């Protein structure tokens, strides 16, 4: 059983998937930093807003002005944090769209070049018929 698991785990697809997940997690952290440390503060400076502390208290006991303190006091609806995460998602989705689009364009270009370079081979029956035709034409001449 261990041997079967080892063979499964070391297949190319499983290893490729694991590498993709690790790279994806690292990419997610980069995007989080981009949104939290660059994009959202920029919008905050323009409008004087800090989205990270925007929330609606869901209980009457919540009187704090920061999200961390409000969460300690009771239930809150942290819509500012949700907005930040939604922006993260949109950026990741857009970057992935650009990557997939460029890969598809590259594949189409390579496929088109390969089709232009190598003409399709004639089927064997057509080749045999052409040989027969040529032999008949040679006998008549």
From Swiss-Prot:
Its placement in the membrane is given as:
Multi-pass membrane protein
PROSITE patterns xref list: MSCL
Q: Which Pfam families match?
A: MscL (PF01741)
Keyword check for Kinase, yes or no. no
Origin, by domain of life? Bacteria
Q: Which SUPFAM superfamilies match?
A: Gated mechanosensitive channel (SSF81330)
Give any Gene Ontology cellular component: plasma membrane
InterPro entries, per this entry? Mechanosensitive_channel_CS (IPR019823), MS_channel (IPR001185), MSC/AndL (IPR037673), MscL_channel (IPR036019)
* TM annotation in the entry: 8-28, 38-58, 80-100
| Cellular localization per UniProt | Cell inner membrane
One term of GO molecular function: mechanosensitive monoatomic ion channel activity
Concerning Gene3D superfamilies, the annotation shows: Large-conductance mechanosensitive channel, MscL, domain 1 (1.10.1200.120)
- Keyword annotations from UniProtKB, A to Z: Cell inner membrane, Cell membrane, Ion channel, Ion transport, Membrane, Transmembrane, Transmembrane helix, Transport
Query: What's the family?
Result: Belongs to the MscL family.
Annotated function:
Channel that opens in response to stretch forces in the membrane lipid bilayer. May participate in the regulation of osmotic pressure changes within the cell.
Q: How does it assemble?
A: Homopentamer.
Q: What is this protein called?
A: Large-conductance mechanosensitive channel
Q: Which organism is it from?
A: Beijerinckia indica subsp. indica (strain ATCC 9039 / DSM 1715 / NCIMB 8712)
